[in-house]
Amino acid sequence: VPEPYPKKQNGQKVNFTSLEELYASFLKHPSVCTDSRKITPNCLFFALSGPNFNGNSFASAALEAGAAFSIIDKPDFYIDGQTLLVPDVLIALQDLAKHHRNRLNIPIISLTGSNGKTTTKELIAAVLGQKFKVVATQGNLNNHIGVPLTLLSMSPDTEIGVVEMGANHQGEIKMLCGMAQPNYGYITNFGKAHLEGFGGVEGVIKGKSELYQAITERHEHIFYRAEDPIQEEKLANYANKTSIDPGQFPEIELSRKEPTLVLSWSGLSIKTQLFGDYNFINLCAAIRIGTYFGVPIQKIAEALSAYTPNNNRSQTLKRDQYTLVLDAYNANPSSMSAALKHLSQIEAPKKTAILGDMFELGSTAAEEHQYIAELATSIGIDQVILVGNHFAGTNTSAKTFSDIEQLKIALADMDLSNHWVLIKGSRGMALERLLEVI
């Protein structure tokens, strides 16, 4: 518990700023920054600290760069009239976000899941944006810092919020729901992601289900995967729900003649820029939620056709002689299997899969990498290339490389003419570096 009157080294007493005072400052300066290198004029700079740095030491630099106030938690960095002292900067940011959320009379849709949550969030936001003023999570700012930043970016004229929630430990989704207080929830799936932090698949299910628990406790509305037996069982006795199930859309047909997904729906042909059968359910979720909120069918189709993946997520990149599908943002056994199966099914002259290591698998890492190596070399993909220490240790007929630089040298001399090339791996592998040579 902090002292009621913290002191600077010179003995000067400094009062803590109350939440009400902090919120009054936010209303005057409704822009929040946490990076002193990205200061916007008249913002509030929250001097967050990490394991290897003291954010308070950047407070004065943020002020010089144009911040209205710096929020600090160390009295020695106090500058009268320019800093606001709080017991803990991170908690102050989270409390401010919750306080702001309580004053926003808008519905918030929150979603989580092992795979597809960022793409689904962006599709939902694009569809709802055809009718409403929507504020959605930027990129994947979906953690204990990103969620409050998303909430604080919602202004009085915001009509719907779409908040993505990420977690790699139990209890995190519950904490994020406490801030966002969602009125609607959706879990994309339960997969083999962050197994190390969650302690196995059962831990993943328990952790992600905290979203539905928070929604049901508040008697709010749930969107759920009807074909997922886990979700079906958990929600069997809950009435306030809407199912998302491709089987409910008999009028939606999925074309396999093109590598990117093409939907026929209600007399419309929707040519998307998304790769992979696994994105079909994400499109269905956006359609179902769009129709639930009364977005016209034509507008939904326009939004889905116009959506372009970015940030290395299922990006289709055309080259003169071949086509790349760059999915280098993240990977786990569930998403890797789905991507490989889709690559094997598309109609293309030749196919190459370049796969990078999957991280955060804990004690199952060797087993899961061996499974993916065997799958990739057994489903009709012409060329399989594996890169990373985990994949290099597998027993496989595929070409293996222990690091990216070795692979770049090999790729520079490789003929990929007429190939569809899937590039997929965990974020830490940074496989987008391969674009320097292909």
Q: What spans do the regions from the language model cover?
A:
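Phosphate-binding loop of NTP-binding sites
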Residues: 5, 92-222, 226, 230-238, ...
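ATP-dependent carboxylate/acyl-activation modules
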Residues: 111, 311-313, 428, 432-433
